[in-house]
């Protein structure tokens, strides 16, 4: 269930403005989405730019590679690709009674994102659309950095994601071949995925130890809509997140 880092990664999106030109590593724990026991994750962090090209990790779906096609004082429009979009769900990671599912794989996804600074209370807003072979989603986030001291920055944020029916059906749907299979006796019904959403709030703190080293902490909560949480392979509809990270800034 390695792709649960996507939930963790959503918190890093809100703080990219304070992590530009950085690499690092994060560690986080979450409430399981699926019926599995794995709830701790290592999250690579990277934010590197050259001219208008960029590589970012710790974003909503891990690694993204892109290009800023428009860049003005108050907005940036970018195109990017995500080699590992979606979720990786392995039946071997599932709890007893749920191991009869077929594996779900990550897929190449493409996206477009508009970052807009409305010049109101130092807010930052982001709107993105991402799509791949197994469907896609629309993302919206709003955040504001608070510079508590010269070394400490705190960034609260709200994030909303809308998933189309193809995406939900592939990653959370249950087809007849997965019902009551050996190892999957607790899956007794099929489930057809429909369009769904999740909404989350989070807060990230970044403490700069010196010019190059920062320590980060983050926490948040995400609520999944019933179109996801009612799936037989989903365990929780509220996902809690807690973690920390170490960042090196160039």
Identify the function of each model-found stretch.
Residues 1-22, 233:
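Cleavable N-terminal export/targeting peptides
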Residues 20-65, 166:
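Short glycine/proline- and aromatic-enriched beta-strand/turn motifs that initiate or cap beta-hairpins
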Residues 21-23, 52-56, 75-77, 120-124, ...:
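Repeated loop/turn-to-beta-strand initiation elements of outer-membrane beta-barrel proteins
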Residues 22-28, 43-47, 91-94, 116-123, ...:
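Flexible, solvent-exposed coil segments and beta strand-coil junctions
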Residues 23-29, 48, 57-59, 79-85, ...:
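Transmembrane beta-barrel strands of outer-membrane/channel proteins
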Residues 31-40, 55-60, 71, 104-106, ...:
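Solvent-exposed loop/turn segments connecting transmembrane beta-strands
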Residues 52, 63-64, 130-139, 143-237, ...:
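Outer-membrane beta-barrel transmembrane domain signature
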Residues 89-134:
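Internal, conserved structured core segments that host functional sites
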């Amino acid at each position: 269930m390695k792709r649960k880092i996507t939930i963790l990664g959503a918190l890093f999106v809100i703080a990219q403005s304070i992590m530009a030109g950085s690499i690092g590593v994060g560690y986080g724990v979450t409430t399981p989405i699926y019926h599995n026991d794995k709830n701790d994750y290592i999250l690579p962090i990277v934010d590197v730019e050259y001219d208008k090209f960029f590589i970012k990790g710790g974003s909503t779906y891990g690694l993204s590679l892109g290009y800023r096609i428009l860049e003005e004082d108050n907005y940036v429009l970018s195109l990017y690709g995500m080699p590992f979009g979606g979720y990786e769900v392995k039946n071997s990671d599932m709890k007893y009674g749920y191991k009869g599912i077929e594996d779900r794989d990550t897929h190449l996804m493409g996206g477009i994102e508009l970052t807009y600074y409305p010049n109101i209370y130092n807010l930052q807003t982001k709107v993105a659309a991402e799509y791949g072979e197994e469907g896609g989603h629309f993302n919206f986030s709003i955040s504001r950095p608070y510079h508590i001291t010269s070394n400490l920055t705190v960034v609260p944020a709200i994030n909303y994601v809308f998933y189309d029916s193809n995406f939900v059906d592939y990653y959370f749907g249950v087809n007849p071949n997965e019902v009551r299979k050996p190892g999957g006796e607790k899956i007794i019904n099929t489930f057809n995925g429909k369009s769904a959403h999740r909404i989350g709030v989070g807060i990230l703190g970044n403490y700069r130890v010196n010019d190059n080293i920062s320590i980060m902490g983050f926490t948040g909560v995400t609520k999944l809509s019933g179109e996801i949480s009612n799936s037989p392979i989903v365990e929780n509809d509220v996902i809690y997140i807690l973690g920390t990270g170490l960042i090196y800034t160039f």
